[in-house]
Amino acid sequence: GAGPAQLRTLLRRISGVDAVLAEIGALGAEVRYRRVLGAVAELEALAVGGAALGERISGFLSRDDTVVARMAAALDMAGDMAGEVAGETAPGDPSGHLARAVRWQRYSRASGSDLHRACGADIARGSLRLWSQACATLPGERPVEREDPA
């Protein structure tokens, strides 16, 4: 006899529930990404209005965390339009971020739709931030020695 875990696995496989859940997630990804773009556009419009508030909003929109969050939303949408993207970069390999940035920048320039151009640009921008955070160098270059701030 099969144990409870094996039975659950078998039922999930037979029912196709995982495929249904994946499809629902993919369909929602574009809606979520459009909402992110809409919120960013509203914040950018508010930033134009006031000096102090505008600086705070601009600072928020340009923070690494915000840029990477936009990239994550774009990657969710890109998973549906460009195949599986989660495995694009090897964990712990900063050069993978640079390669992904180049690939998605090219994609954004070649795309015919505004949505896909924005998506590619957000992925490229976020990938460059992650690459920069990892203190990566260009292929063939030696890493720059950083001074210890202590």
Language model: regions and residue ranges:
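Non-catalytic alpha-helical scaffolds
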Residues: 1-150
